Amino acid sequence: MSYALLRPFLFNMDPEHAHEMTLSLLDKAHKARVLGLVYGQSMQPTDCMGLQFSNPVGLAAGLDKNGDYIDALAELGFGFIEVGTVTPKPQAGNDRPRLFRLKQADAIINRMGFNNEGVDYLIENVQRCKYKGNIGINIGKNAATPVEKAADDYVYCLERVYPHASYITVNISSPNTANLRDLQSGEALTHLLDAIKNRHSQLATEYGFYVPLVLKVAPDLDPIQVDYISQQLLDFEIDGLIATNTTLSRVGVEDLPDGDQAGGLSGRPVSHISTQILQQFSDQLDGKVALIGVGGIDSGAKAVKKIEAGADMVQLYSGLIYKGPGLVQSCIQSIGGYYDAMEN
């Protein structure tokens, strides 16, 4: 069954239940060995952060928080999969309802709150999966951990996931964990990156191999914050930046049903602001830090916009919900066409 036929059925369901059902159906299709026949794998080889990717279009964190569906999702043609956000201990997240579709705007508001089964559960799934491509693991802090002790949670997760991840993303930009975004500014960011990078260097020595470290930031940053974060990335030799997470802005959706719900807004309305922030970081970092563009990509053309703004690779999430799995191939082909045109 095509996604276009399935979507009306899914969109009549509770969003979180529909999310769970979609992943379950995807897993069944994977086990029946039909996914690869439908979607296949487009090649657009990409080197980034010292890693080789089959193509530059990845799955953003949040869709498969616990790594339960890595093999099934990989068959949609992604060049890499990012799982999480995962925390040291399992946690239920915020109360339901916590996920809202804004259909008129092709947007989603979520206040999930890092619901996950804990880092050890995720590691078991990563070890069990058969996918041979790059897997990023996105780490966060437990809601019960005071922000002053956040570094302890991040370092704990870093230690646990290090030997199992292709790269590790430090998520300090979710708006749904109290005070988490405070870690993006001033001494809090410096203290966090210092603790993480010190342990990261030790782990590289202990294991004898290097796992790239990535920071994920919000789109709700002013130029001073962009400048400061950029300098911290350079000072601590962070390998990559994911720009961006969801926004607290409600511009363009404030009058829609559920447009005033608390949480982070993703989808089409965040496209412009996230691309602007990406461009600002690109200007500041001048190719010294790998950039992954995410936010509002619902077409191949939007993916190319991220590349034009300085992204080395892109990630999808909300666009998949509205456009379906065919979006992956569309983005790969559009990016490939863009690079071909640049060479000619």
From Swiss-Prot:
GO function terms (MF aspect): dihydroorotate dehydrogenase (quinone) activity
PROSITE patterns per UniProt: DHODEHASE_1, DHODEHASE_2
Active site annotation, chain numbering: S174
Cellular localisation: Cell membrane
Record bears the keyword Flavoprotein: yes
Catalytic activity as recorded in UniProt: (S)-dihydroorotate + a quinone = orotate + a quinol
A GO term from the CC aspect: plasma membrane
Main localisation: membrane
Residues the record lists as binding FMN: A61, G62, L63, D64, K65, T85, N138, N171, K216, T244, G267, G296, Y317, S318
Pathway stated in the Swiss-Prot or TrEMBL entry: Pyrimidine metabolism; UMP biosynthesis via de novo pathway; orotate from (S)-dihydroorotate (quinone route): step 1/1
Residues the entry annotates as binding substrate: K65, N110, R111, M112, G113, F114, N171, N176, N245, T246
Membrane topology: Peripheral membrane protein
EC number(s) recorded for this UniProt protein: 1.3.5.2
CDD domains given in the database record: DHOD_2_like
GO process terms (BP): 'de novo' pyrimidine nucleobase biosynthetic process; 'de novo' UMP biosynthetic process
Complex formation: Monomer.
Family affiliation: Belongs to the dihydroorotate dehydrogenase family. Type 2 subfamily.
Alphabetical list of NCBIfam families matching this protein: PRK05286.1-1, PRK05286.1-2, PRK05286.1-4, PRK05286.2-5, pyrD_sub2
Record protein name field: Dihydroorotate dehydrogenase (quinone)
Source species: Psychrobacter cryohalolentis (strain ATCC BAA-1226 / DSM 17306 / VKM B-2378 / K5)
